Amino acid sequence: MLTVLAFVFAIAVLIVVHELGHYSVARLCGVKVLRFSVGFGKVLFRRVGRGPDRTEWTLCAIPLGGYVKMLGESARDPERDPPIPPEDLPRTFDHQPVYKRFAIVAAGPVFNFLLAIALYALLAWVGAQEPLPILGAPPPGSIAAQADLRAKDRVVAVGTDEEAPTPVRAWSDVRMRLYEAGIGGRDAIVQVRGADGAERTVRLRELPSAARSPQVDVIEQVGLRLLGGPVTIAEVLPGSAGERAGLRRGDQIVRFAGQPADQASDLIRWIRAMPEQNASIDILRDGLPMTLPVRLGADADSANPGGPKLGKLGAQLSQHVETELIRDEPVHALGHAMREVWRTSMLSLKVLGKMIVGQASLQNLSGPITVADFAGKAASLGWQSFVAFLALISVSLGVLNLLPVPVLDGGHLLYYCVEFLTGKPVPESWQAVLQKIGIACILLLTSLALYNDLSRLFLAHG
C-alpha cells in the first residue's frame, strides 16, 4: 500500500508542477486556457473556474500524465468545433508570436527543474548525517589497491583529466563522482589525505561503467570501502539460512568460512559466491565466542538473469561508520541544488546518448513499475529519501520532455526554432509525418521500459 500511495503522490506532484508551468506562462502571455487536466481517460472530478475564461479543471482515471488545452492550440474541425469569437482570436495559442509559444511549451520542463532545485536546496539546508569518505583497506589486486589507496585515507576531492578535482564532503559525493567518470569512460583523479596528514593524488584507471550494466556497483568493483567497525547482525529473516543456523540480532561476525570478516561488503561477496553450500560462521555473542555451521540458501541474480544463483544468508548486516551532519546555509544550499540538477541532467543525457549508439545497456530504461518500486522504498526510508527521489524523477521528467522528439515538448520547441530561423512554420504535412514517427518512438521506448520492469519483477520473485 505504501508503494502505491508514494507512487501516486509522486506522479501527481510532478504532473501538476509540469502542467502548472504551461498554464502559468500561457496566462502570462494572454492565452486563453480551456482545460487543465491531471491524468487521462475517464473524468473522475470536474470543476469549472469562476474567472472569465471558465477554465475546466479535471482529474482523470489514468494518472500517468496530464495536459493543458489552450484555445487555438490544435487544428479545428469547422463542422464540429464552434467558431472562435473575434474578440478571442488574439488570445489563441496559434496567433501568438513564436517566442511566446516557445516560452509556453518550455515552461513545463523548466518548472520540473525548478521543483528539483527547490527540493535539493531543502535537503541541503536541512542536512543529514552522512558517512565520511574515510577509506578502509582495499582488497588486494583491486583498482584501489593498485592506485595505492590505503586504510584511513580520507578522500578530499575527485575529478578527471577533463574536469579539475572538486571537493567532496560525504561518501555519496565520492560514489557519484566515480559513477560519472565511469559513464564518461575516463580515469578518476582522486586527492586523499593520509592518516599522517599528508595529501597525495592517485589515479583510478579502467573504471567500470554502470551504463553498460545498471546493476554494477562502481564502488565495489573499484575496491573502495568505508572504514568501519565490527560487522554485526541487524536482523534475521524468519525461515532463512541465518535463522536455521542460530544467528541472532546483535551477533558480531568475526570470521566466515575461515576468513576474517572485517568488511560487510567482503562478507556479502563471500556469501553470494557459495549458493547452497555449507560454511562456518565465527561470532561473538555477549562477548562469548561461538562457531555456527550454516547451510546457505540461493537466490536469482538480478544482474544476470538466467545465470548462476547467488548464495543467501537471510540476515541484514550492520557496520558502524563515522558520520557527520552535512548541511549548507540557504544561499549555498541553492547553489548546491543548481549544480546537482545540472550534473544529473548531463548524466542522464550521456547515458541516453550511449544507449542510442549501443555503448550502454537498454536495461537503463525503467518504466512505471520500477519507478513505483523505488517510490515505495524511498518513502519507507523517511521523508528525506522520498524528497530526494522526487527531485531525481523531476529532473528526469524535465530532461525527457526536452528531447527533440515530436509529441514531446522538445519536439515542439524544435519546430519553433526552425520557424524562428526561417520565418515560416514547419508545414503541417511534415508535422503530421514527424508526429507519427515520434509516437512510434515513444511506444517503442515505453514497451522496452515495461519489458525491463516486468523482467525485474519476475526475476525478483523467482
Swiss-Prot record:
Query: Localized where?
Result: Cell inner membrane
| EC category name | hydrolase
Residues recorded as binding Zn(2+), renumbered to this chain, are H18, H22
Task: Give GO BP annotations, semicolon-separated.
Answer: proteolysis
Q: Which InterPro entries match?
A: PDZ (IPR001478), PDZ_6 (IPR041489), PDZ_sf (IPR036034), Pept_M50_Zn (IPR004387), Peptidase_M50 (IPR008915)
Q: Which residues cross the membrane?
A: 1-21, 102-124, 386-406, 430-450
Instruction: Give the PANTHER family listed for this entry.
Output: MEMBRANE METALLOPROTEASE ARASP2, CHLOROPLASTIC-RELATED (PTHR42837:SF2), REGULATOR OF SIGMA-E PROTEASE RSEP (PTHR42837)
What NCBIfam families does UniProt report for this protein, alphabetically?
A: RIP metalloprotease RseP
**Can you name this protein?**
Putative zinc metalloprotease RSc1411
What is the species of this protein? Ralstonia nicotianae (strain ATCC BAA-1114 / GMI1000)
